[in-house]
Amino acid sequence: MDELGVKGFAYVIIRNEEKREWDIQVYVDPRERRKGIGTLLHQEIYKIVESENPSILVTGVRVDKENPAAFYERYGYKKWFGSPSMCYTGGVQPEVDIEFIPYEDKFYEQYAECRTECFYEIAVKNDFKPYVIPLNEKDKKTLSNKPIYVTLHNDQLVGAVTVEDGYLDHIMVSPAYQGKGYGKKITQFGINKALSKGATSIQLCYIEGNSKAENLYKLLGFETFQIMHVYREFMD
């Protein structure tokens, strides 16, 4: 910073204390780039986090506009995964012919099993650990406080969606019911539920390479507005 104002900044926050993962971000005003400011900021912020004995440094970069990935690659960061974000600004979707009810604790085991079946392959491919979240009271309590909606068939969980503050998350269909149009119906329900709660736009994201999810969301009117790539550097 000088008399003309802030030229750039950097910050670091703990991402996962148990795993000693830290998020690190460096930003330089576009008008001040290629002057070594980013390098100086990274050096200074690195000194701060180095004293905490980190295991992994993680940073997220937006690549659909300017792509600063090369800056981090110079310091040894490697791409971890990509996550496009999409936005829906359309109207109410056609009413679906399946019933949804709010999630309750009694669905926990079925929900956890469905979550594992739906996301295990993605977790392994992208090194999202733990690959399987074991049944535990902390997870159960977290889910009980989420605005999750489930649909059942003969008391068996078919699928679910979380609808929170205009954001759709964990859209999933049990493998036994996949390929039958449930993914579309669950997403349509999520859109309508978000709109009924007052949302004027609805967002979601997915992991890069999940073409089925991408195609479904585009079919329903979602448009990509941001693409983030996450990079990490192992320190141990």
State the predicted function of each range.
Residues P30-I98, V230-E233:
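Acyl-donor-binding surface of acyltransferase catalytic domains
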Residues E99-E113:
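A short beta-loop-alpha structural element at the N-terminal edge
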Residues E21, V49-V63, A194-C205:
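Conserved GNAT acetyl-CoA-binding A-motif
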Residues R34-K47, R74, V173, G179-S196, ...:
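Conserved acetyl-CoA-binding loop-helix of GNAT-fold acetyltransferases
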Residues M1-E3, Y11, A123-A160:
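Active-site rim helix/loop that mediates acceptor-substrate recognition in acyltransferases
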Residues G183, T187, N210-A213, R232-M235:
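Short glycine/proline-centered loop/turn elements that form peptide/ligand docking sites
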Residues M1-I45, V49-E50, V61-V63, V158-D169:
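Conserved donor-binding loop and adjoining core beta-sheet/short helix segment
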Residues G8, F81-G82, G159, G183, ...:
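A structural microfeature
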